[in-house]
Amino acid sequence: MSWTYLLMLLFLLPYTGDAVPKINDGEDRVTVNVGDKVSLECRDAHLVTLAFQKSGLMKKPRDLKSRPLNNSETDQFFVIIKADLRHIGRYICTNTETQENTSVSLFVKDPARPFLDIPFIDVTEGADTVGMCFPTDPDMDIAIEKCDGSPLPENFTFTTDIEAGITIKTVQLAFDSCYVCSGNKSGTVKKSSTFSIHVKPVPKKVPTVFLSKSRQLVKTGEPFEVTCAVLDVFSTVKAQWLDVKEGVTKQANFRSSNVFSYNLTLKSDGVPYSESRTFTCQAENAIGQVNATFTLDVIDVGYVNLTVLENTTISVNAGDNLVLKVYIDAYPHPDDGVWTYFNETLLNTSDHYVATKDEGNNRYVSELHLIRLKGTEKGVYTFYTTNSDDDASVSFNIQVKTRPEILIAERTSEGTLQCVATGFPVPAIQWYFCPGSEQRCTDYPPLSPVNEKFIQENSSLGRIVVESTIDVNDLKKNGTVQCVASNEVESAYSVFSFAIKEKLRTHTLFTPLLIGFIAAAGLMCIAVAVLMYKYLQKPKYEIQWKVVEEINGNNYVYIDPTQLPYDNKWEFPRDRLCFGKILGAGAFGKVVEATAYGLLKEDSRLTVAVKMLKPSAHSTEREALMSELKVLSYLGHHKNIVNLLGACTVGGPTLVITEYCCYGDLLNYLRRKRDSFICPKFEDNSEAALYKNLLNTRDMGCEGMSEYIDMKPAVSYVVPTKTDKRRSGSFGDQDVSVSIPEEDDLALDTEDLINFSYQVAQGMNFLASKNCIHRDLAARNILLTHGRITKICDFGLARDIRNDSNYVVKGNARLPVKWMAPESIFHCVYTFESDVWSYGILLWEIFSLGSSPYPRIPVDSKFYKMIKDGYRMMSPECAPLEMYEIMRSCWNSDPLKRPTFKQIVQMVEQQLSDSKGNTPLPYPVSHVPLDHAVRINSVGSSTSSQPLLTNSDR
């Protein structure tokens, strides 16, 4: 690189008053290239100095050497050996005596660096920026822009100067950002490196002060701690605990660019005071100061105080819910307390549960929730709690109002009529007489009783019985006597019919006839009792699906299906149903194939399944079918459950119209497909020998014939094509009546089995999201329709469980024991987790192609012991290892460790995706949104769930 010598002769003319030094040839700007040598000569009659000004600061460069010029005592010679960007600025030659000066600007051009680098600029809000975007080439037009190319902020104004660079006027907080300088010379644009402008906010209000607590109660000698948090826009804020010299720790940090946090913690390991004190935290900035006060209450000994806002004597109607609430003011922290009823501790059950909460400031609340109070549950309920220093208790006297009940209504041997009644409040008994035979006599004047007395039973809060009698000898004619027991709740009555007869002469045949009559009556009573016992032993039809209303620990409160609303939009005209063949029949009713005309749209025909009861059905069974209809309408539509299409509830017996599933139940479908199943070989199948001949044997002697019953076709059977079999609809227009389950001619493989598992998991996830427990999940209760779509159903109506070996007698019920979780078998507990266990058994059924669970193991005492000891079935031959691991997780003895159905959907979906080689799934994934409370945890500590009914529904 060639050297360029620049001689700047600064002549200071002989002092003649106000003469000012001039630059040679009047030049005030000099431009050189980077690396050039620069020489400066400053001449004057007096001693001169050379200064360097940059960014408004006077600072002499370290490498700027000076020496006398030509041995002059006044003139100076300055040399920059190798010019670089550090030397850019204004050089000022000053007469030390007169302070007159002249100056020249030096620019050092560097093509690689068009601007001087600046990493960041700190500026106070409202001020102007200085010292940025200095160009190295004075011939450039300079500007400023944001790093990302976005527009400059609103009100962003700036001025440019070739020496001073760019000055931003009146900086605002919105200007805090990243910027870059740009220069344009002859159409060529060059940019600087990026830099940041940090805007320091100016306080506009006093600081904000928060205390971690405003008050604390301690005993003498106990520790305490309180933190004062101060928030301001800048770190110049001052904060302190007044009149506190020790025990204060400080911590400061920026929460964001415009918020500064300052924490002062006041702490003591042991309160040395014997009385209460206050402490003040003070914060101050340029606007002003603010104080926050903390009160420390000091006591010598702890306490427990109980408060009840309502009356402790409470009357409530039987069947109502009641909440007893006690407010606890205590220090130190009390125990949870206990509720007792006649000195017996109350534990959480379906009839009552306890809820506690901490309201802060040493105040707590304990609530006893009494659900659907019975008349026998009146009495004294007591709450007791204690801490290390004190204890207290409070009692409630609960009176349950019950309707009157007539216990005895008879004619005594003394010729009187006796009426004994009970209830709360104690009922009043009135007697009425009317001539002839009547149902009621209350329109006649009351009779005066001969005697009336009260009988107290058990304790002072036990049942009170009132007894009243009248003398029938005072009645002169035949008629009806009515005993009426009334209180403010309701009335009850009993009627006596009698006739006044002449005294008859005793007949010699009277005694033998009486004995014969009594003997015949006794035999008849015995026969009636036997028939009644057998009737009660018969299984009753009830819907298996249960909708959970509330959960407290392990106790489930199920909603009464009769309380669910029924929307008349489901009504469908009976005359538009054309019934076909019977699809299934059981002890209580049957399912019939039918054609519905105009169900979905006008002039359409749709094959449906219709549930109906037998003509001999009792009122309880009719009510159960109506409950099933209400539950199905409450659940709503889902692809993987048998959906409700309509109903007929007026003008005849109740009919429930549901989707028709052409392939029948999954259990028999799998058995029919055994010969055509393509089974890959998996490793580590310990039970392979058990299923070695599975695909070669059709006569398996399988248990439980719960499928659609086999029947002869009424018309020629039409074999659908492959295209028909794979269509995805759940139902469609059908022109051919089918009396037996259709069959597709496609083979079955492992991917199909995984898909069945996936669809059932989706359906169960949907039921769980609706707080619905199935209680009888098995392959026999899964139906299959076109496209091999599985649908969960409840087949209890059309199944004769008395002749189904899958249902084992246990107590007075027949239960599917091999599908039940241990807690359901041994404790009669049905939860979402017990459904997960049953799902694991269903997986085993699917991958064993319809074999019965626990093969060759009868349900007896040994079976129950095996389940208690943790016995689990081995993997079916056709099950991938991953699917067997899902089965095992469903069979965890701890219900809390079983996966939820949402997790099962994800696990099986992954297996289905892997079996397809990570290609898109052929079946749509319909994840169920949990639009109300997340799935209720039946074994955890969840308190309560969202109600399923509003008050108006009840």
UniProtKB/Swiss-Prot annotation:
State its role. Tyrosine-protein kinase that acts as a cell-surface receptor for the cytokine kitlg/scf and plays an essential role in the regulation of cell survival and proliferation, hematopoiesis, stem cell maintenance, gametogenesis, mast cell development, migration and function, and in melanogenesis.
The record lists the organism as Xenopus laevis
SMART domains registered for this protein in UniProt: IG (SM00409), TyrKc (SM00219)
Q: Does the keyword Phosphoprotein apply?
A: yes
Indicate what this protein is called per its UniProt record: Mast/stem cell growth factor receptor-related protein Kit
Q: What post-translational events are described?
A: Ubiquitinated. Rapidly ubiquitinated after autophosphorylation induced by kitlg/scf binding, leading to internalization and degradation. Autophosphorylated on tyrosine residues. Phosphorylated tyrosine residues are important for interaction with specific binding partners.
**What does the UniProt entry say about where the protein is found?**
Cell membrane
- Which ranges of this chain reside in the Extracellular compartment per its record? 20-512
Catalysed reaction(s) here are: L-tyrosyl-[protein] + ATP = O-phospho-L-tyrosyl-[protein] + ADP + H(+)
Which is an annotated Pfam family here?
A: Ig_PDGFR_d4
Q: How does it sit in the membrane?
A: Single-pass type I membrane protein
Keywords associated with the record: ATP-binding, Cell membrane, Disulfide bond, Glycoprotein, Immunoglobulin domain, Kinase, Magnesium, Membrane, Metal-binding, Nucleotide-binding, Phosphoprotein, Receptor, Repeat, Signal, Transferase, Transmembrane, Transmembrane helix, Tyrosine-protein kinase, Ubl conjugation
Q: Which Gene Ontology terms of cellular component type are present?
A: plasma membrane; receptor complex
